[in-house]
């Protein structure tokens, strides 16, 4: 019956130019349940929740609360109905304090005067009640990502929201913070609050959700009770085929040193401190070494230094015995370095170029693609067509497709095809599966393992601990710009890695 559901989204359709993001989707949320929303990258999950939160208006369909139709024209309407949302990218004012962010827009006042003491009292009471420890006077710019998420949750609770939407809430958290968030969700459930939980992490769904609705390509695939399903069944519903969730690989057979990093330091002039501090390690042929850590701990800057995007302050980098510390990006590429960048749009592709032109960005100057100083379009097309077929890159018009119009997964496949086809000595893969669905992740993992097995040295930089544990032969943890530990994935645990990632431990000592 309708009254069993606190929220019903019935036959929702939402269109954008050229795409139907939500196509006749129905979702029903019970009071006091954790309801997961699962789907591939681009399946329409965030769009559907943005409709519920009033950020988008649907072309068709209706929303009911407790059986009565409601109009949600904007987020203020949603808040008035008790609906709150923690976005994947937090909506906080960095130069404001924690307290000011929580009460922003609903500041208590008396005769026009701000009642900050009253607000502080309510915030601290909520913080204590739900175990969401925060410093109300700290600037948001000075607190950790995990703390920022607590601030976002307290924003919802301060507004007395009873329907809580979490959009990919664990993407930037340590394992310990993820466990803490799961406990907080269970506490909300006991109180009778209802939670909608957008995620692509099957382990988290199995751990905390009561039911799960699956979307595929904007369409409703079904809703299942978690107690009656498996991870394999959920992944099959999500991508339409069986997916191998574990990476199959043989033990590594490391060869000679390919990458030798010695005492690398990089200074951040804006923050007036070192972003990378005296980093030293080696990567051998035929092994995958992973640099793990929470986002913002120097991994990005280190990769920029390694690939030539930024200069080192100090240190030395050797590639296959050759000093490349001061080499140009092109020279590093010629010397055998391939790079799958963290931001495929910023550093991986020229979005308004065709797919074929993107495929030769690293080699258009080579003789096979030139004649008399002019690029041979026929050879570029021939080369691109081969890579598209070999790496199963799907696009509307093949090699002539403008890259901007392709899905994230196929854009990533295009970069991987280009970088691997060069037979590199060293592959640097930075968050290669970020934002991708399980089908694309499975494919990319197989390609990386195959590259290792060919004898390539692989440096993987990842925030996903499942990926780190599955792919790595050795793990290095980076915290605040320095390597604080080296681990064997066969003998360590996610929990142990999490302590080092959070700065609670450093090999040789424990911090307080």
Which sequence ranges carry the predicted segments?
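Glycine-rich phosphate-binding loops of nucleotide-dependent enzymes
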Residues: 2-512
């Amino acid at each position: 019956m309708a009254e069993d559901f606190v929220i019903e989204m019935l036959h929702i359709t939402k269109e954008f130019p050229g795409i139907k993001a939500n196509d006749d989707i129905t979702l029903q949320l019970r009071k006091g349940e954790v309801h997961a929303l699962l789907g591939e990258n681009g399946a329409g999950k965030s769009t559907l929740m943005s409709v519920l939160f009033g950020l988008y208006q649907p072309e068709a369909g209706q929303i009911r609360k407790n059986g009565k139709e409601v109009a949600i024209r904007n987020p203020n309407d949603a808040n008035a109905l008790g609906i709150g949302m923690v976005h994947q990218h937090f909506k906080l004012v960095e130069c404001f304090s924690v307290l000011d962010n929580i009460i922003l827009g609903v500041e208590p006042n008396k005769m026009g005067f701000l009642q900050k003491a009253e607000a502080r009292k309510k915030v601290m009471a909520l913080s204590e009640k739900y175990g969401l420890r925060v410093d109300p006077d700290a600037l948001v710019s000075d607190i950790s990502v995990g703390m920022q998420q607590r601030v976002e949750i307290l924003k919802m609770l301060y507004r007395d929201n009873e329907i809580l939407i979490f959009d990919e809430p664990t993407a930037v958290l340590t394992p310990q913070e993820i466990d803490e968030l799961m406990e907080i969700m269970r506490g909300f459930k006991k109180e009778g609050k209802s939670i909608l939980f957008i995620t692509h992490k099957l382990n988290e769904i199995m751990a905390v959700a009561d039911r799960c609705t699956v979307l595929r390509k904007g369409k409703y695939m079904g809703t299942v009770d978690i107690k009656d399903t498996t991870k394999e069944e959920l992944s099959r519903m999500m991508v339409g085929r069986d997916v191998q969730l574990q990476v199959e690989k043989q033990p590594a057979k490391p060869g000679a040193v390919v990458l030798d990093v010695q005492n690398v330091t990089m200074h951040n002039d804006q923050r007036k401190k070192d972003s990378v501090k005296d980093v030293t390690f080696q990567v051998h042929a035929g092994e995958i070494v992973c640099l793990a850590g929470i986002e913002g701990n120097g991994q990005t800057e280190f990769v920029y230094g390694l690939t030539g995007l930024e200069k080192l302050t100090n240190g030395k980098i050797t590639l296959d015995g050759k000093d490349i510390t001061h080499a140009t990006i092109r020279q590093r590429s010629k010397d055998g370095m391939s790079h799958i960048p963290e931001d495929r749009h910023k550093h991986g592709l020229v979005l308004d170029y065709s797919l074929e032109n993107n495929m030769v960005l690293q080699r258009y100057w080579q003789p096979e693609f030139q004649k008399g100083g002019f690029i041979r379009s026929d050879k570029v097309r021939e080369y691109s067509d081969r890579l598209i077929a070999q790496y199963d890159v799907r696009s509307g018009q093949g090699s002539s497709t403008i890259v901007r119009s392709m899905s994230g997964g196929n854009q990533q496949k295009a970069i991987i095809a280009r970088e691997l086809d060069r037979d590199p000595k060293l592959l640097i893969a930075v968050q290669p599966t970020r934002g991708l669905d399980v089908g694309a992740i499975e494919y990319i993992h197989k390609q990386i393992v195959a590259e290792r097995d060919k004898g390539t040295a692989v440096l993987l930089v990842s925030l996903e601990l499942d990926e780190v544990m599955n792919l790595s032969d050795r793990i290095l943890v980076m915290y605040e710009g320095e390597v604080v530990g080296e681990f064997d994935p066969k003998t360590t645990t996610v929990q142990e890695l999490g302590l080092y990632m959070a700065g609670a431990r450093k090999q040789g000592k424990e911090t307080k």
